[in-house]
Amino acid sequence: MSKSIVAVVGRPNVGKSTLFNALAGDRISIVKDTPGVTRDRIYADITWLDKQFTLVDTGGIEPESKDMMLTYMREQAEIAIATADVIMFVVDVRQGLLDADNKVADMLRRSGKPVILVVNKVDNFDKFMPDVYEFYNLGIGDPVPVSAASMLGFGDLLDLVVGHFPPEALEEEEDERPRIAIVGKPNVGKSSIINKLLGENRVIVSDVAGTTRDAIDTAVTWNKKDYVFIDTAGLRRKSKIKEELERFSIIRTVSAVERADVVVVVIDANEGVTEQDAKIAGIAHERGKGIIIAVNKWDAIEKDDKTIYKYTNRIREILSFLPYAEIMFLSAKTGQRVTKLFDSIEVVIQNRNLRISTGVLNEIMMEATALQQPPSDKGKRLRLYYITQVAVKPPTFVIFVNDKELMHYSYTRYIENKIREAFGFSGTSLKFFIRERKEND
């Protein structure tokens, strides 16, 4: 099952960022050494009572005037409603109940989504509890007093959050059909690609009922194989603020990627790979998804016999953390190579499910260590005892060594490259865990 998504909504200066950062702590979902991965703390993966969820901060841009305030908050509420399973609505006990709070509460109430009313800045419960009671007037349940700055009340808050998640026994049965998310920054042609795919005569299309988000998922059959395409549109109305639009685009991407097996990252051929493209690709990479880079609007590019080669090299250079990603060039406008996307998706799915026997893996590892000696430090040399595959989707391996401190990242990458040379694994990341064991174990 994918992790539930919890969105944080509220006016500027009510302490959303403080609450988000305090809850996220060091568990923020960011790979610091990965180029192009977002570092603006929009989302974090959190575990509480053995339940994992993704916390999303919908804030970030402060309105320039009071007139913009309600529009800004409505957009926050819309993105939360479109993507979240549970919504944290944060208000400020010291400012009291404002008209904007009432209007957003109305939107959240009508959505039918679980809403937790978080009354922040309650540093002294005895002093502020009478003021907390005022927020009952919002009509969205019991207010939960917390102090983000002092981390007071977090246990009760998180208990309520995970209490809204469905019990495991009641969760949807695992759908065996591969789930495909087509993501990308605004205006790269995501909808055009989906519409072109779904408009093909050979494609059988139906809506998927009972999904956990408002977005409509679409069941697709192609060449007698079933897929589910995730609708990443979410917030249909565009924001007037560029930075806000980008932030909401990333939030929608997190929501879609969480549920996907394969992520198609759409890039505009006219623009090349932008910083936001890299951020979006990084989200999929962090979460170990299958990845296809689809360069759209290829019909608009003047070409010679080296154009694809140059474009591919440039993409590999900028997205250096995705050497395994499939790359394809297409045009939603003309339909050029659009249905070839199914072929790439199928390749990635097969590679994500590929299992390699322990015997074969150890032969590869022994050959690799013979070609390039493992590193050493202060006279102690790394010894690799054996390797085994423990999971798929993505393929996951455990390497047993004498001292995991000696297993540098570069040598793990070397072993990964040797495995890829033998089996390809195109389109999927590989995960490696290093474990120590004594020589006589």
UniProtKB/Swiss-Prot annotation:
GO molecular-function terms, A-Z: ATP hydrolysis activity; GTP binding; ribosome binding
Residues engaged in binding GTP 2: 184-191, 231-235, 296-299
Disulphides: none
Annotated residues for binding of GTP 1: 10-17, 57-61, 120-123
KH-like domain residues: 354-438
Domain EngA-type G, first and last residues per copy: 4-169, 178-353
A biological-process GO annotation: ribosome biogenesis
Entry keywords, A to Z: GTP-binding, Nucleotide-binding, Repeat, Ribosome biogenesis
InterPro entries linked to this entry: AAA+_ATPase, G_ENGA, GTP-bd, GTPase_Der, KH_dom-like, KH_dom-like_a/b, P-loop_NTPase, Small_GTP-bd
TM spans (from-to): none
Description of how the protein assembles with itself and partners: Associates with the 50S ribosomal subunit.
Purpose of the protein: GTPase that plays an essential role in the late steps of ribosome biogenesis.
Family recorded in the similarity comment: Belongs to the TRAFAC class TrmE-Era-EngA-EngB-Septin-like GTPase superfamily. EngA (Der) GTPase family.
Name used for this protein in its record: GTPase Der
Source taxonomy: Bacteria, Bacillati, Bacillota, Clostridia, Lachnospirales
